[in-house]
Amino acid sequence: MMRLFAVLLCVVVLVPAASAQPAPQDRAPDDEVRQHLRTRIEAQRRGLDALAVEGETAQASAAVQAFYEDRQFAPVWVGPSGPTPAVDRLLTVLERADRDGLPPAAYYVDDLQALLNEIRAASGTDAGRLADLELLSTDAFLLYGSHLLTGRVSPTELEPSWNVEGRRGDLVSVLREAARTGAVAEALQSLRPPQSEYAHLKTALQRYRRLAARGGWPAVPDGESLKLGAHGPRVDSLRRRLAKTDDLTAERSAAPDSFGVALETAVVTFQERHGLEADGVVGPATRAALNVSADARAEQVAVNLERWRWLPQSLGRRHVLVNIAAFRLRVVEEGEDVLRMRAIIGRPYRQTPVFSGAISYLVLNPYWHVPHSIATKDKLPEIKKDPDYLARQQFEVLRGWGADAQPIDPSTIDWSRLSASNFPYRLRQRPGPLNALGQVKFMFPNRHSVYLHDTPTRGLFARAERSFSSGCVRVEKPIELAEYLLANQTQWAADRIQTALNTSAAERSVFLPEPVPVHLQYWTAWADADGTVHFRADVYQRDDAVHRALSDRVQ
């Protein structure tokens, strides 16, 4: 027996007086369906019962009610002859929801198909079953549309610190237009993220799912590192593995178990796509990435498609985009990258938060006002071990955080008596070559107290994995970024910036005439326009939670 459908009304229908209704044979099926819809939805509005999803409240019950009341309960998916072609078009779209990384089962595909088959087998005359189909189809459209528009998973449930305003839209209006034109697929297509990155990832998802369906790729067995000149069956496994993902495109060697130059080049290509040290040597890290299954990579792509659905309609005509998981910063203008650089992000226990803001000013030769947590956890132990630590590292000690706080002599403080619970001081590092913020910081005021900044520790940018900060983002090319942001201010030409940095140790704020949006996001997979797919390690261990939530049948 068929399961209860998503938007069936569990109501006790009050039968009107016979004189108030035309005889059944005098009424078209869609007229009877309209009456069923009116009775059920008005009962729901009066609180007599609720639209139900297999006994649960319908996912889009409020929108369903608003839609039908606005059109005087006229059906969309049912006509005088029964189900319309629009139902089939909707079903086709829903069956392809997995192309967006969404589970078709969440949109009642099996129930819709079974109900449609039942109605057509019975010549489509049962008004009650037609009303069931009508309500189920509408709820499926609205639910799928809402997931394309804002995501299936609530980012704030997974990340309480999430602070990005997502897209908004009037789904009832979209459905109304689809009902008017019959363009169901086009209406739902309009709800997808407009960014090209989303479309590229969709293509990547299909590619990796095809690879998985064909058996994936061979594993590279454990053993010593493989490099140029190596021989043996493990080299042949490596060759076949890299060919599956088109990292190895050169003609197959006459000696497939020999590690030649073409294979070394393919290894470097793979390493670059995965954010690994691109040395052409297959060590433990590279082998681990090679042996991640095609299914797992497809899931990773689906997770990152969802992350795009959480974002605003527009990131800004020009904007700064930090991919935390990739340790990269891009400056984008009119959809094109105009500046790229490496970045250093927060350690796993001091994670860089995901949020959006707007860079409104720069600070040249900044002081570093050490956060209380860092002062007590990191700096206080150093001070206790070495009385000269503060002077050598150019720190000042102030009592309190007010603007009028004055420096005090650190030698007058009994540091041994202090701890995190009774530390009343503020540490401030003077501008200069030792300053942790380097020569410039980029400010976008936010509740996380996070910003972009230079760093004197330049060597860390050479590392493949760059999670070394306390939450803020260190940028590889701070002067180039400053020059870009100040390019339209004639008084701040490149030479003037260098002069201000090199001839004065005084802190100076420079405000932008127009704030520039900045987005700190977390993507572990993305695809280029040429089809190159990139993956990164899940440094903050966030992918699994999104994947589990996406995989649930009902949210």
Which ranges hold each PLM region?
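Positively charged n-region of N-terminal signal peptides that target proteins for export
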Residues: M1-L4
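Well-ordered beta-sheet/strand-loop patches within structured domains
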Residues: A20-E69, L135, D139-L143, W162, ...
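Cationic-aromatic interfacial patches
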Residues: P22-E165
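Bacterial N-terminal signal peptides
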Residues: A6-P16
